[in-house]
Amino acid sequence: MLMPRRVKYRKQQRGRMKGKAKGGTFVQFGEWGLKALEPAWITAQQIEACRIAMLRAMKRSGKIWIRIFPDKPYTKKPPESRMGKGKGNVEGWVAVVKPGKILFEVAGVDEETAHEALRYAASKLPIATKVVPRHHIGGEAV
């Protein structure tokens, strides 16, 4: 699973997911990308499930780039514990994703295979996504 090697602070506040993504909104490395259309927390397990699904769809050919990293810890209190007594233990790691963020990129495979691989990855995610080509800005090609 993806997670930071070490962090300055073990626990974080939840924060808010307002607005659109500031960076990472264009396909930079591959030929096709998977773009988020909704805000969400994507867990390390979901990212790994997407990676495996794409590898299977691409039959281990081509290259995959994961453009998000789970760097935010999320905590959970034990079941049936009363309120208070401090913040819960770190349960896992999430990547904060805002609309417009490119999640995954693929290259080295034909268009049909790339679309299929990214569609499989999208089925593992809890948000709406769309497949975008490398040079796609608005409606025109660059």
Curated annotation (Swiss-Prot):
Cite a GO CC annotation: cytosolic large ribosomal subunit
The record describes its quaternary structure and partners as: Part of the 50S ribosomal subunit.
Q: Could you tell me the gene encoding this protein?
A: rplP
Keyword terms:
Ribonucleoprotein, Ribosomal protein, RNA-binding, rRNA-binding, tRNA-binding
Q: Would you tell me the protein name for this molecule?
A: Large ribosomal subunit protein uL16
> What is a single Pfam family found in this protein's UniProt entry?
Ribosomal_L16
**Which terms does the UniProt entry file under GO BP?**
translation
**GO MF annotations, alphabetized:** rRNA binding; structural constituent of ribosome; tRNA binding
- Which family is annotated? Belongs to the universal ribosomal protein uL16 family.
Q: Which CDD domains does the record associate with it?
A: Ribosomal_L16_L10e (cd01433)
Q: What does this protein do?
A: Binds 23S rRNA and is also seen to make contacts with the A and possibly P site tRNAs.
